[in-house]
Amino acid sequence: MANSQNTATVRDFLDAAWNRGDTSVIDRTAAEHHVEHEPDGDQLGRDHLKETVLAYRTAFPDLQMSFEDQIADGDRVVTRWTASGTHLGELNGIGATGRAANVSGVFIHRLADGQISESWSMFDQMGLLLQLGVIEFPAPDGISS
């Protein structure tokens, strides 16, 4: 029973926040002292989670995520997702490119007392930057592009 409740909580959060931009869902699905584990250090609190969602939803106003797989075990829920959208706003210093992007990734959420207490996110950042035209792969030696 706990696995299905945890899965429902995570699905509610992901769909409302990421697909509809409704960050109010975070107040009921995420713990007050939520920890978002990021490559540059842990970020604490619901407000940071809201800011993250809003940053991506502002940069990609038509952002849509599809949830390909979801697996729950104990207090963890793992979700494999694909996101698509059009880059129409600034994101991390990258001005709007007007380009469409499609990336995949994985969220891991740990729940405690029915709320998301920790989150990890891994996604194809290199693929996103390539699709936005921010970076290019260099042509191998001897091959002209």
Per-region residue spans from a language model:
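C-terminal and inter-domain tail/linker signature
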Residues: 1-145
